[in-house]
Amino acid sequence: LEKEPTADDFGRPANKWTYKNTDIGTYVDYSLMVAEYTNGVSGKEVYNKVGKTAMDKYDVAAYVDGNDASKAILPNVAKDNKDDLTGTDTGVLTQVFVNDDEKEAVVTEINTYLGIADSDYSAKKDEADFTVYGLKKSGKVHVMDKADDGKSYVSFKVSGEDFDVSKVEEDDAYLFTVAAGEVQPFVPAETIKGTEITSFKKGSNVTVGGTKYDFSKAAYYDNEALKVYTGENNNDTINLKDTTYNVYLDTYG
């Protein structure tokens, strides 16, 4: 059994294991992780976790969904920055790694996207088709797209060779992560089906059954559909009674 230091598709430090030239798998080296967040976190907080020595002398990098984002993020990792670090927000998994032996540090941000199955699993093709929302294709990679034009989605064919999709049924909801131009591990979404929404604030929160849920950064909703019920300027707190909706929850509460 052999171990080779590497990085996973999200840019996190990892170890690749092989046995007699056969790949066993690549696994994140969590022993190097010094902090983890699922909400907005200040540039000062991340700076303190990385440490002054590492920020000044180590090779430091930053990635969003596996895409190099060092130029956008690292200037904001500063001891006097009390604002949320670029890209960090509700529902974004931000992880900070420091490797003192190799003098390296990495900040990674992983978004979670809603995907809906387009059809039942095809046993003949051994695959399932999904539409994943809040994304767009940019060259060979995918990036978050928050445009309200109804076109913020990407279609994926997921093979049974890569993931167990044998139980996927049409309209099933899943929580997707995406990196390196490909689907990464995904899980079924917790769904509140056929519920009334008592209030909705665009880009902020939704209230269902007396419970207020904050929107994930990658939350997606059909802006044109909202206009049917709320008018052209649907950016205030509004009432959506007399209509039922499906509300999808991520794993971060």
Residue ranges of predicted features:
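...the same signal can extend to comparable exposed beta-sheet modules
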Residues: 1-253
